[in-house]
């Protein structure tokens, strides 16, 4: 490759990477500021915050390859605070959250599940049942409230977007929750989660620093229809 061309290519790549970091950082600031329960929205003229949030949503990807780096508890608390500020029916907050960021505990749960379902471990690159993430958020719902699962979904989306704004990837995992629920060997770990009476594990969210950059998958725009 021509030396001058290589220089220009590297310079452009550097600019693009810096722009990406800037917008993710800006999105993180906007997202986390929005999680302040005492703050009211304010008009802004310097930056179009709506486009930044839109870009954050559109750039999000499900991540299934993670670095081993741990997420600090302070960072996790900021992300989860955004989660619990999602809208929910009648403000019942009909969910409970358990966070597992101990590698030893994740390995123990994985071993228990695999003991009852060995085929899970046959997956390529398998390390744990949470797509090899170093952290997992387990979300349970109130089985006595018929809208609780909707509330859990809204909670999860806030968690996912707040994490992405901080450069942390995620993946929603219904299968992991099902494996835990269906595994007799994993019952001690489910009991250890100590969900309240009438609460049941619904799904998990894997969290970690991404070790991949997947392309967006097609979405079906024709699923949207306006009624006149």
Regions found by a protein language model. Name each.
Residues 20-25:
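Sec-dependent signal peptide recognition
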Residues 1-18:
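Short, Lys/Arg-enriched N-terminal segments with co-localized hydrophobic residues
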Residues 35-228:
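Acidic, surface-exposed loops and disordered segments
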């Amino acid at each position: 490759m021509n030396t001058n061309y290589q220089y220009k290519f590297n310079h452009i790549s550097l600019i693009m990477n810096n722009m990406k970091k800037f917008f993710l950082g800006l999105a993180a600031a906007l997202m986390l500021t929005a999680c302040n329960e005492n703050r009211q929205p304010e008009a802004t003229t310097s930056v179009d915050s709506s486009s930044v949030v839109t870009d954050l949503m559109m750039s999000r990807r499900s991540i299934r390859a993670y670095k081993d780096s741990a997420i600090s508890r302070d960072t996790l608390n900021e992300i989860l605070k955004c989660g619990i500020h999602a809208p929910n029916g009648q403000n019942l907050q009909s969910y409970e959250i358990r966070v597992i960021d101990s590698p030893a505990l994740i390995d123990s749960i994985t071993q228990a599940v695999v003991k009852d379902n060995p085929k899970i471990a046959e997956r390529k690159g398998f390390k744990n049942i949470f797509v090899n993430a170093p952290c997992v958020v387990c979300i349970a719902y109130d089985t006595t409230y018929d809208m609780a699962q909707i509330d859990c979904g809204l909670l999860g989306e806030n968690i996912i977007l707040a994490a992405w704004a901080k450069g942390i990837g995620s993946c929603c995992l219904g299968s992991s929750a099902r494996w835990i629920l269906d595994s007799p060997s994993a019952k001690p770990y489910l009991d250890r989660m100590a969900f309240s009476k009438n609460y049941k594990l619904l799904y998990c969210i894997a969290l970690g620093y991404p070790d991949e950059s997947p392309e967006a998958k097609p979405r079906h725009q024709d699923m949207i229809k306006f009624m006149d």
